[in-house]
Curated annotation (Swiss-Prot):
Substrate binds at H8, N27, Q83, G89, Q90, T91, V92, H98. Keywords: Apoptosis, Cytoplasm, Hydrolase, Magnesium, Manganese, Mitochondrion, Nucleotide-binding, Nucleus, Phosphoprotein, Transcription, Transcription regulation, Transferase. The keyword Cytoplasm applies. The keyword Cytoplasm applies. It comes from Rattus norvegicus (Rat). The modification Phosphotyrosine is found at Y114, Y147. Phosphorylation at Tyr-114 by SRC is required for induction of apoptosis. The active site is at H96 (tele-amp-histidine intermediate). The lineage of its organism: Eukaryota, Metazoa, Chordata, Craniata, Vertebrata. The record marks Y114 as: Important for induction of apoptosis. This is Bis(5'-adenosyl)-triphosphatase. InterPro entries: Dinucleoside_ppp_hydrolase (IPR052677), FHIT (IPR039383), Histidine_triad_CS (IPR019808), HIT-like (IPR011146), HIT-like_sf (IPR036265).
Length: 150
């Protein structure tokens, strides 16, 4: 079973957590090590269109996933980011939260991470030549999946 993520079909091998309403996946082109995505299962383009139960699940699970990736990737902080609409930089028409574990000095200026996220999915820079291999992504997902199997 594949997961729908806007115009993309996501293989189960790169999904490391699924709840009744949300799923978490590794990123094919991470801005920092451990950069993952959290999405509602229902393909909804804008945050305002999520139901209250979807919002609650999305953010409760985002909190759990953030805690795990911060620990696993030896971060000291986390950046959570959501681009909601084209003028906000959204390129995938499916609500999603970027979860990025952070470390001191990972960017020259702290806010440079937002510049990196802005160009992260631009069409001219989003080609398979820039993506990680399916094997690498599946291996990372397998490691992260273990944190949630209790």
């Amino acid at each position: 079973m594949s997961f729908k993520f806007g115009q993309h079909l996501i293989k189960p091998s790169v999904v490391f957590l699924k709840t009744e309403l949300s799923f978490a996946l590794v990123n094919r082109k991470p801005v920092v090590p451990g950069h993952v995505l959290m999405c509602p299962l229902r393909p909804v383009e804008r945050f305002r269109d999520l139901r209250p139960d979807e919002v609650a699940d999305l953010f409760q699970v985002t909190q759990r996933v953030g805690t795990v990736v911060e620990k696993h990737f030896q971060g000291t902080s986390i950046t959570f980011s959501m681009q909601d609409g084209p003028e906000a930089g959204q390129t995938v028409k499916h609500v999603h939260v970027h979860i990025l574990p952070r470390k001191s000095g990972d960017f020259r200026r702290n806010d440079n991470i937002y510049d990196e996220l802005q160009k992260h999915d631009r069409e001219e820079e989003d080609s398979p030549a820039f993506w990680r291999s399916e094997e690498e992504m599946a291996a990372e997902a397998e490691v992260l999946r273990a944190y949630f199997q209790a």
